């Protein structure tokens, strides 16, 4: 399974109008071709005026076929023309699920706030980090944080990266859960081994778009 992670930054003040216009019709057109998104978010803390949406596919071939059909749809073409000029930047990356995720029986919602965490791993160290996390990190982290919305590794785009998303009720819930995790000796032992393997860590807090119900 792969996920197309798409990040669009709008001109200041235009994102609410984009969401309203998109929800009124184009969302139905897009989901008719691509299926339901795995996430459709608005950045709350991070790169503001940005929407992040994630679409799942069986493989690259399925993604191409579905997107080709969507791009040929007259309703979608009309929407693209109406929406031209809304965004100042658009980027996407293709990622694949890590071998140990999804986990059967793991909580899957509901959530109102998502911690969107992108880590860049030192060159050549990604397999080592994933193995270490699977054996020593996943247990304490999932015990304390609970709702893992997704856990992916880079495929097309930026390389040597992992993306993991954690759902929370709100900011207070996030602070409480992360505080408990960071105080756990098992997590502290994992972090001591993992930090030398990491090159860069970024996080954004995102909320669900008005029309997206996880």
Name each model-derived stretch.
Residues 1-214:
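Short S/T/G/P-rich N-terminal loop/turn motif that feeds into the first structured element of a domain
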């Amino acid at each position: 399974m792969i996920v197309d992670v798409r990040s669009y930054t709008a001109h200041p003040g235009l994102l609410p109008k984009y969401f309203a216009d998109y929800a009124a019709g184009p969302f139905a057109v897009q989901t008719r071709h691509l299926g339901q998104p795995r996430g459709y978010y608005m950045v709350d803390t991070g790169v503001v005026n940005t929407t992040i949406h994630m679409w799942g596919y069986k493989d690259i071939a399925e993604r191409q076929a579905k997107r080709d059909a969507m791009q040929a749809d007259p309703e979608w073409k009309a929407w693209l023309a109406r929406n031209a000029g809304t965004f100042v930047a658009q980027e996407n990356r293709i990622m694949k699920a890590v071998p140990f995720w999804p986990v059967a029986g793991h909580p899957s919602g509901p959530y109102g706030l998502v911690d969107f965490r992108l880590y860049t791993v030192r060159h050549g160290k990604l397999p080592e980090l994933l193995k270490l996390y699977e054996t020593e990190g996943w247990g304490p982290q999932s015990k304390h944080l609970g709702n893992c919305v997704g856990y992916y590794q880079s495929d097309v785009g930026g390389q040597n990266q992992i993306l993991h998303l954690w759902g929370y009720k709100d900011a207070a819930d996030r602070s409480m859960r992360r505080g408990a995790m960071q105080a756990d000796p098992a997590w502290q032992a994992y972090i001591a081994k993992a930090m030398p393997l990491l090159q860069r860590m970024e996080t954004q807090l995102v909320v669900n778009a008005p029309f997206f119900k996880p």
